[in-house]
Regions:
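TRNA-recognition modules of translation machinery and tRNA-sensing kinases, especially anticodon-binding
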Residues: 1-534
Length: 534
């Protein structure tokens, strides 16, 4: 990597002949400071040429590892010290123009980037031409972020999708041969009227459907979460944009976020034209409503763990408070899935138990391992499912040196383990598309403790971890393998039915909508008859 640019230094008065010797002395000192800290002077910087006009001193600077913003601030400090002492000349401002960054190889980057005027490939190197940067821009780490962004884009392009970096860790034995149930539970739940489509990717869960979701969730809490010492907290479900900026979700997954806007005013009279229109026309045109709300300042709960990092942000933690082990199940999460929406498996609004923890690296790894054992027992013994675990390394860990060759990966470092369950209705288990990711467990390293400035009072490194249990997907997994007859369910679920009788399903003159749906519901009632509240 190489940098080159023209730095315009505005001084406190016009340069006169008597100043030139002092300027030469100052620039000699600048030369020493531009290579300071580098064993190889080529990695530092140098002043290739200089000129002046009026009160502006102009320097052409080139450098290796030393970024131009850093070089510019070094120049400022030296000029202020030398010229201020010898000639009573002060520095009033800086402006970097015609700046160029040369990168090895061809960087496959498209689109428009801040402060970037254009790209070109010359002799196998990528040349990036930057827009002018004033002193305020140079003081901010804009150039550093830009270079990181370019690196991330290149890493993303090489890294590809998750499927390219998926490696099987462990798989259960074959239990369903042949599968006792092969129907699609998504269709059965809808046809029998247990759920009703509310909007795209949203469902209303009738009391019986809500009961089934709660059943799976409660057994999970009893078998996995509470025995490991996690305690419940309640997290907000609408987050300021600043939180998403720190977690990286706003930059990395903005296409999946659902945003929220507030009204421009609380004065109801300001809405009179709109409310009158809606009264007369009995419609709410989105484009008109949009005129009365602010630009989005929030996004709805996406990963559910974001408030955990925010809470500890800027705080000092001691050993007595560690490890911190919380979980939240207080409300829905939202993800815009576009064309991939299907049944209860892939929705915009869903419910989950989010398990989060904070501690030293050793504590975080130990907790993850305890959770992993509990998850395996939950899937294999408690729910008696066909399951598998896969190691998935998020692309952004490549930059931090945490990526290894897949044949020698180590799970005790930042990364993610996915839990997948076979859905017989999709086809044979040998087909990867027949497996559903029902949850995951992650070690983040310092990915969140650093941007939120979560610190240990003795300077020890702090890591975080999280695990998401999506209630809808786990329920679908159980029903897909076991069906709707409780006699085929594992003992823990039948015990829950006996302790907590399920409610009657809803039946109306016009609901369920179809004859086949009514038959499905009648069959379900027969299955549950010995447990229903009657």
């Amino acid at each position: 990597m190489r940098f080159r640019g023209r730095l315009r230094v505005e001084l406190s008065r016009e340069i006169v002949e008597e100043d030139l010797e002092a300027i030469r002395e100052a620039l000699e000192a600048v030369g020493h400071h531009l290579v300071k800290g580098f064993r190889n002077p080529e990695e530092g910087g140098r002043v290739e040429s200089w000129s002046y006009s009026g009160r502006v001193l102009e320097l052409v600077i080139s450098s290796g590892r030393l970024r131009l913003d850093e070089a510019s601030m070094r120049v400022r400090r030296v000029l202020e010290e030398v010229l201020g002492r010898t000639r009573r000349l002060g520095v009033r401002g800086l402006r970097l123009e015609d700046a160029v960054v040369e990168l090895d190889g061809e960087v496959r980057v498209g689109g428009r980037l801040p402060f970037v005027r254009g790209f070109e490939v010359v002799g196998g190197r990528t040349v990036i031409h930057l827009e002018p940067m004033d002193e305020g821009d140079l003081k901010r780490p804009i150039l550093l972020r830009l270079l990181r962004l370019l690196n991330e884009k290149e890493v993303r392009a090489r890294w590809g999708g998750k499927a390219e970096h998926w490696q099987l860790i462990k798989q259960s034995r074959v239990k369903l041969e042949p599968p006792p149930y092969t129907d699609d539970p998504n269709k059965v739940l809808e046809e029998a009227g247990l759920v009703k489509r509310f909007s795209v990717g949203q469902w209303l869960y009738t009391p019986l459907a809500a009961y089934l979701l709660r059943m799976v969730r409660e057994v999970f809490l009893e078998e996995v979460v509470r025995p490991l010492g996690f305690v419940e907290a309640v997290f907000p479900k609408m987050y300021p944009l600043e939180v998403g900026l720190r977690t990286g979700h706003l930059r990395g997954t903005i296409n999946s976020l659902v945003f929220a806007s507030l009204p421009k005013t609380y004065d109801i009279e300001e809405f009179e034209e709109l409310t009158d229109y809606m009264y007369v026309m009995d419609e709410a045109p989105p484009e008109e409503v949009g005129r009365y709300v602010r630009y989005p300042e929030y996004f709805l709960c996406f990963a559910q763990c974001e408030p955990f990092y925010w809470f500890f942000g800027g705080e000092l933690v001691d050993d007595g408070a560690l490890p911190v082990k919380w979980y939240d199940m207080s409300g829905p999460s939202f993800r815009w899935e576009s064309g991939g929406i299907y049944g209860l498996e892939r929705v915009i609004e869903f419910h989950r138990v989010e398990v989060v923890w904070l501690g030293t690296p050793e504590q975080v790894v130990s907790i993850r391992n305890d959770l992993l054992k509990a998850y395996e027992k939950f899937m294999d013994e408690v729910l008696d499912l066909e399951w598998r675990l896969a190691w998935v390394t998020p692309w952004y860990y490549e930059q931090s040196g945490t990526v290894e060759k897949v044949e020698e990966f180590d799970i005790d470092r930042p990364g993610t383990i996915d839990f997948e369950v076979w859905l017989p209705y999709r086809g044979p288990r040998e087909d990867r598309k027949t497996w559903l990711e029902v949850g995951n467990i992650s070690i983040h390293g310092t990915k969140f403790t650093e941007p939120f400035r979560i610190r240990h009072n003795r300077g020890r490194t702090l890591w975080t971890g999280c695990s998401g249990f999506g209630s809808q997907r786990w329920l679908i997994s159980v029903l897909a393998q076991k069906g709707f007859n409780p006699e085929n369910w594992p003992p823990k679920l039948r015990e829950y039915l006996e302790r907590n009788p399920p409610p009657d399903p809803i039946v109306l003159v016009t609901y369920p909508k179809t004859q086949s749906g009514r038959r499905e519901l009648e069959q379900l009632v027969k299955y549950l008859s010995k447990y229903l509240r009657r």
